[in-house]
Amino acid sequence: MLSLRHCPKSARSALCSRPPGVPKPRISYPSLQRSLSTQSTEDYDVVIIGGGPAGLALAAGLGTNAITSRLKVALIEASSLGKVRNWMEAPGQYSNRVSSLTNESVAFIQSTGSWEYVDTSRVCPLEAMQVWDGISDARIHFSPSDLARLPTTGAIPDSMAIMTENLNLQRGLLKRLDSVPNVKLLDTTKVEDIQNDAGENNSWPIVHTSTGQSLRSRLLIGADGFNSPVRKFAGIESSGWAYDTHAVVATLFHPYRDKHATLAHLEQPNSTAFQRFLTTGPIACLPLTSTASSLVWSTTPLIASTLKAAPPATLAIFINAAFRLPNAALQNLYSILLSAHQKETPLSPEAARAEVQQAEIAYSVLPHDARASADIDSLTKGVLPEGSNLLPPLVIGIQDKSIAGFPLKYSHAETYIGTGRGARTVLVGDAAHTVHPLAGQGLNMGLSDIRELVACLGNAISTGSDIGSYTALLPYMRARYMSNQSLLLATDSLHKVYGTDAAPIVWARSTGLEIINELSAIKGALMGVAGASPGNVGTSWWNAAATGIEGLAGAGDVLRAVGGGLKDAITKTGSNIVQGGVNALKNSRR
């Protein structure tokens, strides 16, 4: 069970006590290098640093809320927001950076009036999810119907989430902000320095920009990513580590799957997310349209760089194989791929296809089996093989220039609120935390931060409080810190548990996955508290889930080897957090 001992000491202090009276001696700040008299200084109630999805959503939330809309707000972004506002892909082309927005997140965006500016022809409802073990093939399936057995505050949604390109969301938010009078957007403007007004504790921060303008703010909000200047100014430390894992992303193309075709029960529309946990990292295929999907393949840095350097057709062959072939076959394919790369003779599509075909023969995969992918021409014609709905559609092409990669990391700020000479600052989104993408919750975490912060500031205004004071911001910290910590720890644990092929661990995690897949109450709780249901989730969800668990004698003992507290994991990890100690959930009712 997650407890306060998992958090940094300063976070525990913030969550349990009043604000500290003196600044921490370890925090240091640069001295002012320029004369303020040479620059104009303008006062704002709120200054937001960062114009990504989180920063724009925060600006929209503040600018459209009935209470906070009276605040004078500025948003500073280093890049050009004009490019985002005018973004337009060619027909059939898609950005390689996409997000899965939970129904809760969509509801928040809708509440700001921004969703009507999102191009809904470029969004895809996520109607189901298939997650399975790359060694044992133990599987769990999620769909909105799993919510039907649980108490909710509203109707069961038709979809679990909405897939959309990040740029589509950003453009919609920008268009909404065009009609919000009290929010000023300052793009192509870099933050040169952040200083205290007169260098005093609790004084207003002053942001000096590359354009020569200075902005003094009652509250400075960092929505400025992992390398947050606001966090550095506030002297807030962040703990974490880099994973020995990189993510490869790309836009994939598939044959059309007509759900109204003859033998429709064998055909499926492209509205299911697929994720397979390989020992080198999870691979996910996320639907965009009936014929396009987004790839997120987390693997070792060496394999990632080799896949990116390979011909796109070779990468497509490896993607199909990674979802279908046994672990031993994949390890052999990796060796062949790396060997060819080291010899500076990248593996050709023809050679890659031949190797996959040999692997299929070696592991008794028949030519028209759902697990086959070598003879792609015959597999994409006629009636699909039985079991095709359990696997993503075959990749027949990759969008030009869509292949990219980036390192993965875990981080969590020790607090979200600045104190002392770093006072009147608060962090949201990636400035406060970064998470492994296997849970698909990074942006949703940030939007949850923003929703709580807007509510917190609205309450401060309603009670006549100073919106930049520690006490006014503390409810936001208390609402979000432990929630985010739960998700971060559970996701990190999943990454580690599925990164081994040790037989006892494989057996334990596979047994747990199969047990939970048979319990709709548990699956519904996983989805409900992850935001699949826009209604509030209360203790009744846990009671329903625990009731289902108690009928399963010995399940807690079976899963204890995996460790962790399922209730904490479920609470914030969402549909991918399917491992943990079921016994902890049983005990939570006692």
Residue ranges and their predicted role:
Residues 121-234, 239-251:
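Conserved N-terminal helical subregion
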Residues 61, 85-136:
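N-terminal FAD cofactor-binding segment of flavoenzymes
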Residues 1-42, 589-590:
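N-terminal mitochondrial targeting presequence
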Residues 47-49, 63-97:
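Glycine-rich FAD pyrophosphate-binding loop
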Residues 114, 227-274, 279-282, 289-294, ...:
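Central beta-strand plus flanking loop segment that forms part of the substrate or channel wall
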Residues 38-54, 74:
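Beta1/beta-strand and adjacent pyrophosphate-binding region of the FAD-binding site
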Residues 393, 455-590:
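C-terminal helical "tail/cap" subdomain of flavin- and related membrane-associated enzymes
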Residues 310-468:
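FAD/FMN-dependent oxidoreductases across multiple families
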